[in-house]
């Protein structure tokens, strides 16, 4: 038995390359189904976030296909353009990488907390698809436990060190704009969080709602709402537009935007695949930020020092996983 992984992330490829691996739930179900048709593969887990897509595979020792090629084939994507923009790890390096990932030290924003939830969700979806074998289950369990231990032991980041608060900082830095009214497109988890943070910081925030889901929505306290179909009309009254949806299509299109009498000066796109047509940055006096443009944290001296403490903590969980593997293999010999 062997564990292998491969992935693409913000360090290896820009957003226009990565967004090809943003899967809907229906697509993900089909991808899992296609992967498990290979009898040499025992289990698989796919982590898909705005900054990365990674595939973890439990397989026979002599399985020699590139894991990322496996993912591409299962998703109906040509592997050729991605041959030089992904990384592959095998054996002990896989759980070490996963532990570091879950701790947030491989994130674009150092130490961010959302990745733990994303790792949990990834193994949960794999389990739901009946794609996770016991080796992957235990490996992910140990990585999540390691991340929780790190978070409770070390202070990796402040509340402000998140993509939402990075977006807030961009807004606050626009000193000459006199920003008051902000439109948030999207009422999912990210959209609600962004709306809450804006209101907490004294901005008037309006969040879009889909008409057919009005009664199912949770609306942040003191937030205004507008039907999604009226978003362009609302933009006339706004200084900033932030979009954070899971839509496979643009929520802000160039052609529709040009029809507005008064176009907001600042657009922030928190989605992958992108919500906002990138060509709008060619309009005069328009600023557009996407998840890459919001900026990655540099590895500071403080981060390097923290990394040593993190390595000491996760080593225990890596050892625990190895002990479990030895026990599991020992049972097989009885």
Curated annotation (Swiss-Prot):
Binding site for NADP(+): 186-191
Keywords annotated in UniProt: NADP, Oxidoreductase, Porphyrin biosynthesis
Pathway membership: Porphyrin-containing compound metabolism; protoporphyrin-IX biosynthesis; 5-aminolevulinate from L-glutamyl-tRNA(Glu): step 1/2
Gene Ontology molecular function: any one: glutamyl-tRNA reductase activity
Annotated substrate binding sites: 49-52, 107, 112-114, 118
Gene3D superfamilies linked to this entry: Glutamyl-tRNA reductase, N-terminal domain (3.30.460.30), NAD(P)-binding Rossmann-like Domain (3.40.50.720)
Important for activity (site feature) positions: 97
Matching Pfam families: GlutR_N (PF05201), Shikimate_DH (PF01488)
Domain of life: Bacteria
Domain-related comment: Possesses an unusual extended V-shaped dimeric structure with each monomer consisting of three distinct domains arranged along a curved 'spinal' alpha-helix. The N-terminal catalytic domain specifically recognizes the glutamate moiety of the substrate. The second domain is the NADPH-binding domain, and the third C-terminal domain is responsible for dimerization.
NCBIfam families: hemA (TIGR01035)
Family: Belongs to the glutamyl-tRNA reductase family.
PANTHER family to which the protein is assigned, alphabetical: GLUTAMYL-TRNA REDUCTASE
Protein name (database record): Glutamyl-tRNA reductase
Species this protein is from: Alkaliphilus oremlandii (strain OhILAs)
Gene: hemA
């Amino acid at each position: 038995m062997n564990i292998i992984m491969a992935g693409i992330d913000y360090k290896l490829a820009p957003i226009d390359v990565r967004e090809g691996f943003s899967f809907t739930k229906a697509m993900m179900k089909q991808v899992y189904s296609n992967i498990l048709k290979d009898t040499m593969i025992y289990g698989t887990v796919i982590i898909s976030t705005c900054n990365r897509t990674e595939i973890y595979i439990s397989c026979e020792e002599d399985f020699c296909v590139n894991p990322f090629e496996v993912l591409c084939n299962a998703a109906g994507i040509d592997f050729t353009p991605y041959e030089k923009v992904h990384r592959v790890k095998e054996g002990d390096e896989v759980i070490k990488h996963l532990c570091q990932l879950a701790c947030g030290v491989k994130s674009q924003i150092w130490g961010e907390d959302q990745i733990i939830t994303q790792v949990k969700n990834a193994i949960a979806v794999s389990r739901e698809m009946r794609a996770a074998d016991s080796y992957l289950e235990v490996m992910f369990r140990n990585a999540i436990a390691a991340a929780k231990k790190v978070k409770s032991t070390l202070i990796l980041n402040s509340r402000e060190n998140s993509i939402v608060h990075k977006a807030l900082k961009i807004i606050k830095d626009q000193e000459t704009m006199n920003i008051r009214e902000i439109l948030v497109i999207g009422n999912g988890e990210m959209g609600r969080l962004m709306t809450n943070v804006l209101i907490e910081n004294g901005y008037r925030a309006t969040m879009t709602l889909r008409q057919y889901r009005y009664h199912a929505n949770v609306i942040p306290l003191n937030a205004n709402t507008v039907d999604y179909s009226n978003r362009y009309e609302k933009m006339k009254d706004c200084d900033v537009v932030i979009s954070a949806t899971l839509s496979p299509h643009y929520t802000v299109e160039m052609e529709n935007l040009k029809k507005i009498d008064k176009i907001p000066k600042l657009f922030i796109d928190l989605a992958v695949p992108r919500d906002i047509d990138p060509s709008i940055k060619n309009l005069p006096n328009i600023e557009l930020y996407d998840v890459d443009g919001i900026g990655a944290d540099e590895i500071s001296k403080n981060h390097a020092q923290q990394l040593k403490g993190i390595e000491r903590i996760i080593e225990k969980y890596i050892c625990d996983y190895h002990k479990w593997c030895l026990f599991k293999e020992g049972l097989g010999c009885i």
